[in-house]
């Protein structure tokens, strides 16, 4: 009886102890869950890279003094790194554009209404999500294509840039279709599809989860994009160096 009375008198302390134990257990559980989720996310990011991450570096810029000349400056730096030091150096940018031929394609617009639902571009189904890059990026990631497959071709005095399309559009966009970018006026020729390929987050490759490219487009920088300081400025902190290709 004394034991029972003691328990009843101290039930407040027991309750507090139970609550604290529950909180401690919950925090431990959430910590383990978050660590596992982070591990899984980092593994997904590692799987996107085909290069050795111990020898892969990101070129970072804390300050850009002259934005207007950035495109010219950064391209000169990348060329010097490649030519003088024989180091793979590539950058990419995820951008939104629109193709003249697709902006009036009912099937494409209907498909994109579902793809872009609940996003910033929900009211703009003609928008196309594009990954544009230096071909040297193919030394860092494996998307099932090679550098020569991204080489532009000339026909009738016009330059056509190879374009690879996410498999989600396979029934809408066909190989050898020609698409015209409404912003730069670039002409693209569809060369193939991206099957089960992932890519980095547009803001930060190492902080945010990867996403699939089922409804994205992949191509190389056009001449106009290479010289466009806005486009090149957006590649800041997405410029990669592969040191195992350097001269010893």
Language-model segments: what does each one mean?
Residues 57-62, 158-167, 239-241:
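Short hydrophobic beta-strand segments
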Residues 121-219:
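Hydrophobic secondary-structure segments that place a key small or acidic residue at a functional site
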């Amino acid at each position: 009886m004394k034991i029972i009375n003691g328990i009843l008198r101290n039930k407040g302390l027991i309750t507090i102890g139970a609550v604290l134990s529950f909180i401690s257990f919950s925090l431990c559980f959430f910590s383990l869950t978050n660590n596992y989720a982070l591990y899984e996310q980092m593994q997904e990011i590692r799987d996107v890279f085909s290069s050795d991450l111990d020898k892969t570096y990101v070129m970072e810029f804390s300050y850009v003094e002259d934005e207007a000349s950035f495109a010219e400056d950064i391209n000169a730096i990348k060329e010097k790194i490649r030519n003088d030091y024989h180091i793979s150096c590539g950058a990419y940018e995820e951008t939104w554009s629109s193709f003249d031929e697709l902006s009036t394609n009912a099937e494409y617009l209907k498909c994109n209404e579902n793809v872009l639902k609940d996003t910033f571009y929900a009211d703009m189904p003609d928008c196309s999500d594009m990954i544009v890059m230096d071909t040297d990026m193919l030394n860092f990631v494996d998307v099932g294509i090679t550098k020569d497959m991204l080489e532009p071709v000339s026909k009738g005095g016009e330059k056509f840039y190879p374009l690879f399309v996410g498999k989600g559009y396979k029934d809408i966009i066909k190989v050898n279709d020609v698409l015209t970018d409404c912003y730069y006026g670039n002409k693209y020729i569809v060369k193939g599809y991206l099957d089960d390929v992932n890519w980095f987050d547009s803001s930060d490759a190492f902080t945010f989860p990867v996403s699939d490219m089922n409804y994205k487009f992949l191509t190389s920088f056009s001449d106009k994009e290479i010289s466009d300081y806005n486009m090149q400025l957006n590649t800041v902190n997405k410029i990669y160096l592969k040191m195992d290709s350097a001269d010893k």
